A protein has these predicted regions:
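Catalytic cores of carbohydrate-active enzymes
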Residues: 1, 40, 95-104, 111-167
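Aromatic-rich carbohydrate-recognition surfaces in CAZymes
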Residues: 2-96, 119, 123
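Surface loop/turn signatures of beta-propeller and other carbohydrate-active proteins
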Residues: 47-48, 109-113
Length: 167
């Protein structure tokens, strides 16, 4: 199980109208969020995994926006804002001068590669984060320049992605 799949499952619960169960999924994420705003890449695995993936952390924004659009529960956005804001702060620390985001961090360092799929997911996550911030009148820590730089990197700097393996 990873945080991204967990959020996808919560969105499936949203579509089916399982509001209480979906909210429990977000409570689970809140419980296991690391102090730096991230989540481990894998839960319930026999292998020790200390990676923290940026697109996994930021994806909670997409899930929260999905929950809100399904249930129109603004209190949910307020309640989980600190979780979301911390996750986005973690992700933003991984943006490079090219606009892409390092895909993961180990115990100490960012891994020097970016994934096109991961950065595409981050783009949507940052977009949803901005919508949530506006909806509940919270400080938005994502600048339009950061989004523009990511979009331009995705469109024009393919050399930035998947550098450590063939995709």
């Amino acid at each position: 199980l990873d945080p991204w799949d967990h959020i996808e499952s919560a969105m499936g619960l949203d579509v089916m109208g399982f509001e209480v169960e979906s909210k429990k999924a977000y409570n689970w994420l809140r419980t296991y969020q690391e102090k730096d705003g991230s989540w481990p890449s894998i839960f319930y695995s026999t292998e020790q995994n200390k990676l923290k993936e940026t697109n996994f952390s930021s994806y909670i924004a997409v899930g929260m926006w999905h929950y809100y659009t399904n249930f129109n529960d603004k209190d949910f956005l307020y309640e989980f804002w600190p979780v979301l804001d911390a996750a986005i702060e973690f992700t933003l620390t991984a943006q490079t001068e090219h606009g892409d985001f390092f895909w993961a961090k180990d115990d100490k360092n960012w891994l020097d590669d970016s994934l096109k799929t991961g950065c595409s997911s981050i783009y949507m996550s940052l977009f949803c984060y901005k919508k949530i911030a506006k909806e509940i009148n919270k400080q938005d820590r994502v600048s339009d320049i950061q989004l523009k730089n990511l979009k331009e990197c995705l469109r024009r700097k393919s050399f930035r992605f998947d550098r450590n393996w063939e995709s």
